[in-house]
Amino acid sequence: MSKADQTSTYDLLFSLLRSALLGETCPVEIDNFAALLHEAQRQAVDGLLYALPQLSVCEEERPLLKQWIGGLLPLEMANRQMNQVVVELARAFDAAHLRYVLLKGQSCAAVYPRPLLRRAGDIDIYLAPQHFEEAKCVLQNLGFVFDHQTLLHEVFERKGVTVELHRALQPMQWPPAVKHLKQMMHKEVDTVGEWQHFVEIDGYNVPILPPHLNVVLLTAHIMVHATHLGIGLRQLVDWGMVLTTYGHRLDRALLKNALSQLHLTRFYRILSAFSVEYLGFSAHHFDLSLLEKTNSTSAIAASATDSSPSSSASSLVPSSDSSAYSSSSSNLKYPYDSFDALRAKSLLKWSIKVGNHAMFGSSFSRNGGFLAHSCIYFYNMLLHFWWVPTEFLGIPWYMLRRALYRLSFMKHT
């Protein structure tokens, strides 16, 4: 696919996603449905397009459209089955009086206009340290079989459904960030008395993270994947949907402090810029105080006064790169500067290149061992170091820690 065709395809994909999620008007006629569907599937967002009232394609592509439409019922059925498993686990953990929270995936799907259209992955559940071993027994009693473990989680499977029991929220690389995140979870999850935060799935209240910690998790999750093997649009849409849904309930002081301690404030700004510019979310859902940069007053003032409907992401990047992918951009009273816009655009380009996370270089990484991981590390550091410098500086330490963990695990098996 040529660069021009790719640009056109992603302009159309973003327009259709904004229509499916936010009700914006979308194009009536789709010139190249095959290319659009291919990219939507690479990004794991094709299911969201089922929400569109109508798609009009040329005569030659109608068989492909009908074939794709035939996938709607299987997708909804798969998500219903996934929800049933989530509720089954929640009931079992509640009966055992365990402290746990549902992470990412199905908890994000619950805030979509049509939750059954989001393509599901694994079921991720965080367990407080004092309940981790008991939770493993609960899973095994339900017929789940242990598959493997990492520094982050232990993985169980049953009839094609994968459950990851997390002993940590997210594998941060920078040692101080690891420490701060562990302290946050201990204070705000592990030792809390009566739990107050739930999402309703199939009529059952399933515990989830407090809103500010949920935002921290999703920000860190995207950052980790984006700075390693890559990130797809599904996770980026999740982030925007969660901020749009829970933005008014965020404890902004706690969020600001957590992002600062984990060195994620800049990446939060990048995701905010991405969400507004490309996904069409309204800026008022985000904590604008986190986006203000004291060393960029003039840039902030300039962008904050530009509310022209014709403004787009391309206006915030150098003129030599004016072919930027178009934005929705009808709500640009938004204090980010050209550096944030450039990084948001680089995140978009990276997502387009790699597709849904781990597609880029995944086989090379699995088969190449330390050399492969080192090559990917230096490649990403060269391109994306300024997204989150501390994480890149911490990766060698984390790789060594993971290698020692694997050696220790092998000695005991």
Protein language model features and the residues they cover:
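Conserved NTP-donor binding/palm subdomain of two-metal-ion nucleotidyltransferases/polymerases, i.e.
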Residues: 1-121, 127-306, 315, 321-413
